[in-house]
Amino acid sequence: FTRKLFGFSDRKEDTFIGGLSMGGFGAVRCGLKYHQTFGKIAAFSAGFVLYQIMGELLEKGIITDDKLMNKAYKENIFGAPETLRTSEVNPEYLVERMLEEHVEIPDMYLTIGTSDFLLENNRSFCKFLRERNVPVTYTETEGTHNWEFWNRQLEPAILWLLNEGEQDNSKAITLPHN
């Protein structure tokens, strides 16, 4: 629709997806699921909460309400908890499947504040990617889960998406794809 309405390029290398918080999770998930459409993915403070949901299921055998999401919300967003490991809603599953099928994985840019409550989740996902030699630019800088942080990170992310300008990658970890 947008390509026809606005005359956007239909080339994968010209098409990016990004988001923040749960939208960052959604951008990663959609960018991987629709890898034939998106050339790059940018996620700010991505809501990689599947780790907690799957951990809770393994630990307690049930999904419960917590301060961020109640059980019904979790199930509406992510589906049946017992299927999360092998569900297309799980970015790790999508990556594993793409690697098995030798499908090109879009480059990813992940950024997170060092005081963000999702820091460990983002580190875990970056580690997962790194262990599989999936290309990722990952940055941790001072900040928390708010617009002040995201506004500061927007310009470096856009420059990365467009392959333009100089960036301070002193804290970035760029992993080549083998």
Where are these regions (language model features)?
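Non-catalytic cap/lid and distal C-terminal segments of serine-dependent acyl enzymes
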Residues: F1-N178
